[in-house]
């Protein structure tokens, strides 16, 4: 025990000069390092200073952390009598420190805290959040994973009625909320195409209005009269409804074949799909009493959608699609599944229901004439209609080809 006391007594004079020199250097400099005045050593530091040097010499390969562990364990087992001289030395160093630095105040060193990473929301969530501010979220069809071009076709709104532009798109929400969960990666690719696509379609649907699309309807109007008027003369011609029904069949085509190639069908010229809607609404009003309920439902849907803007009609018409689509799948002797780009076939699919009720022979003749006209017109269809038609073959087989 005396040997340890002698060692500490020998080392204790050496403890003071480093602390004094460091303190005087810090006090005389009056520089930035004056803020870093070291704290006075406590009893353990006074004792462990000499012991650390001795243990490092005995075990040169031992790490400093291991030395600290052993010194701490050894200090704990020491008695009060053994610690007394080191405690006294620490008191003397503290008094000296207070004398040299009367205004010293311990300021703990600020530890650089690692910044917590912000939660990265997915792009879909970001798009849905943006939809709350009046922007549009993007929902992709099952075939939309191949690229961004296919995803833009079935754009939808997640939060209807929010923001300035959300009022026009509010009714599109009923089309693909739970049916088509889009992948986030493809949604990111589709977000770039979204703005230009939306601007073009909105401009085509709002600015031309009812007057802009009807000039495209009339060139097809004479073609329907030879096929329909001989069989459906008792039903009068009501005025064509507002331009909302023109999107009935492009949305139904998307519903049955949501493929990337259908984007060109969605964004085709107004003469392409404008005539489809007019012919479909016209044939419904010209139909026999069996299709009168369908026409009434379509008219009610169009009237309900008229108050929500030009684009608001898309969702409401899609919601009424189940009442229109059953004749498509109904297999009769004269029924043929429609090609989305063929005007004649969409007309002829309503002919058998009206013709068989009145004159079956006349209905068969009209269906044959419509089939001949359809096959002759298939070769002159635009490329995007053919692409959409080939996509439909997976669900509705084309028997006339």
Curated annotation (Swiss-Prot):
Residues 1-38, 197-249, 320-343 are annotated as: Disordered. Residues 235-245 have a biased composition (Pro residues). Residues 197-208 have a biased composition (Low complexity). Its main location: nucleus. GO terms for cellular component: nucleus. Keywords: Activator, Developmental protein, DNA-binding, Nucleus, Transcription, Transcription regulation. Transmembrane segments: none annotated. InterPro entries: HMG_box_dom (IPR009071), HMG_box_dom_sf (IPR036910), SOX_fam (IPR022097), SRY-related_HMG-box_TF-like (IPR050140). Gene3D superfamilies: High mobility group box domain. A motif (9aaTAD) lies at residues 345-353. PROSITE patterns: HMG_BOX_2. GO terms for molecular function: DNA binding. Residues 213-234 have a biased composition (Basic residues). Pfam families: HMG_box, SOXp. It is found in: Nucleus. GO terms for biological process: nervous system development; regulation of DNA-templated transcription. Residues 37-105 bind DNA. The 9aaTAD motif is a transactivation domain present in a large number of yeast and animal transcription factors. Transcriptional activator. Participates in neural induction. This is Transcription factor Sox-1. It comes from Xenopus tropicalis.
């Amino acid at each position: 025990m005396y040997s340890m006391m002698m060692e500490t007594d020998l080392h204790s004079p050496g403890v003071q000069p480093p602390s004094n020199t460091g303190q005087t250097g810090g006090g005389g400099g009056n520089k930035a390092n004056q803020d870093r005045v070291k704290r006075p050593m406590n009893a353990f530091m006074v004792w462990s200073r000499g012991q650390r040097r001795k243990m490092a010499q005995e075990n040169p390969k031992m790490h400093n952390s291991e030395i600290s562990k052993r010194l701490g364990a050894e200090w704990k087992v020491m008695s009060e009598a053994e610690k007394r001289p080191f405690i006294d030395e620490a008191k003397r160093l503290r008094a000296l420190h207070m004398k040299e630095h009367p205004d010293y105040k311990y300021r703990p060193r600020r530890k650089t805290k690692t910044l917590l990473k912000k939660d990265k929301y997915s792009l879909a969530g970001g798009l849905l959040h943006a939809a709350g501010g009046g922007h549009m979220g993007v929902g992709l069809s099952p075939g939309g994973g191949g690229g961004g071009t296919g995803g833009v076709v079935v754009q939808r709104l997640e939060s209807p009625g929010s923001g300035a532009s959300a009022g026009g798109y509010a009714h599109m929400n009923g089309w693909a909320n739970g049916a088509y969960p889009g992948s986030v990666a493809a949604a990111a690719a589709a977000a770039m195409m979204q703005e230009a696509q939306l601007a073009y379609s909105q401009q085509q649907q709002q600015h031309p209005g009812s007057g802009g699309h009807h000039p495209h309807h009339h060139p097809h109007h004479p073609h329907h009269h030879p096929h329909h008027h001989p069989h459906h003369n008792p039903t009068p011609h009501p005025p064509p409804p507002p331009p909302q029904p023109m999107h009935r069949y492009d949305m139904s085509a998307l519903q049955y074949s949501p493929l990337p190639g259908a984007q060109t069908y969605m964004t085709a010229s107004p003469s392409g799909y404008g005539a489809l809607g007019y012919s479909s609404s016209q044939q419904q009003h010209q139909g026999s009493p069996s299709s009168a309920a369908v026409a009434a439902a379509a008219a009610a849907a169009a009237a309900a959608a008229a108050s929500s803007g030009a684009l608001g009609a898309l969702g409401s018409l899609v919601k009424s699609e189940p009442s229109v689509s059953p004749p498509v799948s109904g297999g009769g002797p004269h029924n043929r599944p429609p090609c989305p780009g063929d005007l004649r076939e969409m007309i002829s699919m309503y002919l058998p229901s009206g013709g068989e009720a009145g004159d079956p022979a006349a209905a068969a003749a009209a269906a044959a004439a419509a089939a001949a006209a359809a096959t002759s017109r298939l070769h002159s269809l635009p490329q995007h209609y053919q692409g959409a038609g080939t996509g439909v073959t997976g669900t509705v087989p084309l028997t006339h080809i």
